[in-house]
Structures are given as structure tokens and as C-alpha cells.
């Protein structure tokens, strides 16, 4: 999955995106511009910046939206994060809180808010409910359904058979 977003280089095979083969040099910046996001299996080491708060973790993949001259508009990042926290039922509702101090389910919601804020076309969910409680699972499933209803494409990788059957 990480190869699809350019985090790892491919060693064999082809990646075809919108009918065109992705050539060597594929990286995360190009994947983002192509409209691909990833909710990684290991959110703690690959999903968010451990030393950053929630609003920074949501904004990191779309900083151009927050630029005012050479700086980013912190108030705009905070307001954006607050909208997603409300929509996604994130607790605690503190956008200035460190993402690493949140529960697993709420960390997943912060990462998903990043991709929803970035407005990617394809989101890859790699073990999306690994290590999250039942309530957070239900909310993540609801958000996945909402993305599909909004015309987004999702790819789900799950080792949980009931989850895979329920999503398909």
C-alpha cells in the first residue's frame, strides 16, 4: 500500500493510475497531487507527526490552503480542524491536543480528516480499525460510506474477515 502512495519504491510490477503507467520517481508528493491518500496500518509511526497537535496533523498534507505569504494561517488550520472534529465526533474536541495522546480510534479520525481536508479522490484504508474500539469502528465505517457517497474511491485492506465482508 505504501508503494501506491510513493512512500516505498516499487521493486516489480506496474502501477496504472487513470489509464497511465506511473513511471520511476513516483513519490508521496506526486501521489498527493494525483489525489491518493493513505490511512496506514501503523498509524503511530506512519500516520501522523508524533510531536504535533491535531490541527497541524490535519493540515500537513494541504499546507498551500493555509498559506498567507511565507507563513501558514494558524487560525484557519484550527477552524478547519474544528469542522472535522465536529463532523467525525472526535474526542476530546481539542484541536490543540497532541495527536499521540489520543485514543487509537481518534488518531485514525485525525488521519482521515487530513485526507478529507486535502480532497483526495482515492483513499487507501490499510487495516483501518486495527486497535480501535467498537464505537470508533462504527464511526470509521460510517465515514467510509460517506466518502463513497461523495464520489470518492476507497481501497480497504483488512485481515479481519467479518470487516472485509461487511465493507464489501
PLM feature segments, named:
Residues 1-168:
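Glycine-rich phosphate-binding loops of nucleotide-dependent enzymes
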